[in-house]
Amino acid sequence: IAGYIITREYTDDTMKNISTIPISYRQLLSGKLLVLLLLTICFSFIGCVIALAINIIAGFSGVHFGNLFNLFIRVIGANIGIYISVLPIILLFCCSANNFLGGVALAFLYGYFGSFVGKLLNYYPIKASMILVDSACDAKYGVIYQISPACITIVLTFLISMIILA
């Protein structure tokens, strides 16, 4: 979705029309990234509502406000962290008309490697976003993650994104 939204001006050849508006490309891109963040939050919320509906329809026990609120916070928090983790890839590949597909492939691989288990993954941005919402996510495999390296990783990834955007 990010590549599609960001490259519309190039693929539809509307950049010349937009350039008459007194905003810089950086401001336009920042606005689109904000829309993508809001879409991330909305899709996270919709996913939680669907999960809630399935739980109620299936009659699973343990569906109460405390669990639901915890689910919503964790899912939305993890997805915002994943958004921040993928942001440098989005920014690096968004500047040309048809190059965003390479960014999609790279982001897929980048996310895939986040599914592995290991202590070094405290420093892997995709896994770090999940560690921030549940540091015991792989305790059953004997791996205990730490929140502070994960937090540092997410902050550094965000700072790298802001440097690329500047």
Language model feature labels by segment:
Residues I1, S30-C95, Y141-V143:
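Secretory targeting signals
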Residues I1-D12, V117-L121:
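Transmembrane helix-boundary elements of multi-pass transport/secretion proteins
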Residues A2, D13-M15, P88, P125-A128:
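Hydrophobic alpha-helical segments typical of transmembrane helices
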Residues Y4, C48, L52, I90-L91, ...:
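Transmembrane alpha-helix boundary and packing residues in multipass membrane permease domains
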Residues I5-L37:
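Helix-loop-helix units of permease transmembrane domains in multi-pass membrane transporters
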Residues L52-H64, N98-G102, Y123, K127, ...:
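Transmembrane helix-loop junctions in multipass membrane proteins, especially transporters and channels
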Residues I84-S115:
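Functionally important transmembrane alpha-helices
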Residues V104-A166:
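Terminal transmembrane helical anchor/hairpin motif
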